[in-house]
């Protein structure tokens, strides 16, 4: 390679790196900042599954009463095409009955068990008296001013259409987020109703990471408005230490190192994209997420997070 060619190559690379860094810090130079219809720091996972039975009206009411900024919930569709709030497609874990939501009419759904495991807290259970599986429209009616984050749990066109219709019926486009880790579901949601903001699918999260570490992210337009990701390190507390191999521990460490990046969070935030980290249940986890620049935290313990935020200065 001649010295002239080498100089041109280095100049081009240098220009690219400088431009990438500049746009990473100041994305408004290239992209119009997305309008934020609401801002959520305190997000109650399944309504707060550590303080009330998950995805119940009692859980949602408790979370709203203490001042949560957002309810996170999961949706399935019944045999008679009713949109219900339930995390699992099969109800064995939550009700003790080995049956699929889609195989029963709404009136046939069994009640939740009176005691359920807290999903992201090892060896912890939550008890409650409200064991009824609610309809999504009940949640919309009860909390008309509360932002709601909807996980569309199955790739079902009728479910997606019904949820969209309910959002429009209750005029909640400005207070709703929807999607799933599955990119096909997210694409269908966006196609069905582009007025409802969508979250990043797993495939898109991985793409964003690839673009970030190659310096290309500042140049790429983004349609999603909510970057919702786990904190990989919490996996270590959910399992018995002796059950985690060294290889698994390394993968957890690597995932955490790649995903928990303040520069990434700050860039997305500057573009009007909210960053939510899930599902965190300890104060040191809350602090780490907010110190990294997360917009909000999803928790099973809304009271604990509320107390933390009352004393936390970002």
UniProtKB/Swiss-Prot annotation:
Keywords: Cytoplasm, Endoplasmic reticulum, Hydrolase, Lipid metabolism, Membrane, Metal-binding, Transmembrane, Transmembrane helix
Catalyzed reactions per annotation: 1-hexadecanoyl-sn-glycero-3-phosphocholine + H2O = 1-hexadecanoyl-sn-glycero-3-phosphate + choline + H(+); 1-hexadecanoyl-sn-glycero-3-phosphoethanolamine + H2O = 1-hexadecanoyl-sn-glycero-3-phosphate + ethanolamine + H(+); N-hexadecanoyl-sn-glycero-3-phosphoethanolamine + H2O = N-hexadecanoylethanolamine + sn-glycerol 3-phosphate + H(+); N-(5Z,8Z,11Z,14Z-eicosatetraenoyl)-1-(9Z-octadecenoyl)-sn-glycero-3-phosphoethanolamine + H2O = N-(5Z,8Z,11Z,14Z-eicosatetraenoyl)-ethanolamine + 1-(9Z-octadecenoyl)-sn-glycero-3-phosphate + H(+)
A Pfam family recorded for this sequence: GDPD
Molecular-function GO term, any one: metal ion binding
InterPro entries, sorted: GDPD-Related, GP_PDE_dom, PLC-like_Pdiesterase_TIM-brl
Origin: domain of life: Eukaryota
Cell location: Cytoplasm; Membrane; Cytoplasm, Perinuclear region; Endoplasmic reticulum
One GO BP: N-acylethanolamine metabolic process
Induction: Up-regulated in white adipose tissue of obese mice.
Enzyme class: hydrolase
Regions crossing the membrane: 4-24, 196-216
Residues in the Cytoplasmic compartment per record: 25-195
Domain GP-PDE: 40-309
One GO term describing the cellular component: endoplasmic reticulum membrane
Tissue expression as described in the entry: Widely expressed.
Regulation (activators, inhibitors): Lysophospholipase D activity is increased by magnesium and manganese and inhibited by calcium in a concentration dependent manner. Loss of lysophospholipase D activity by addition of EDTA.
Annotated PANTHER family: LYSOPHOSPHOLIPASE D GDPD1 (PTHR42758:SF1), PHOSPHATIDYLGLYCEROL PHOSPHOLIPASE C (PTHR42758)
UniProt similarity note: Belongs to the glycerophosphoryl diester phosphodiesterase family.
Protein name: Lysophospholipase D GDPD1
Species assigned in the record: Mus musculus
Gene encoding the protein: Gdpd1
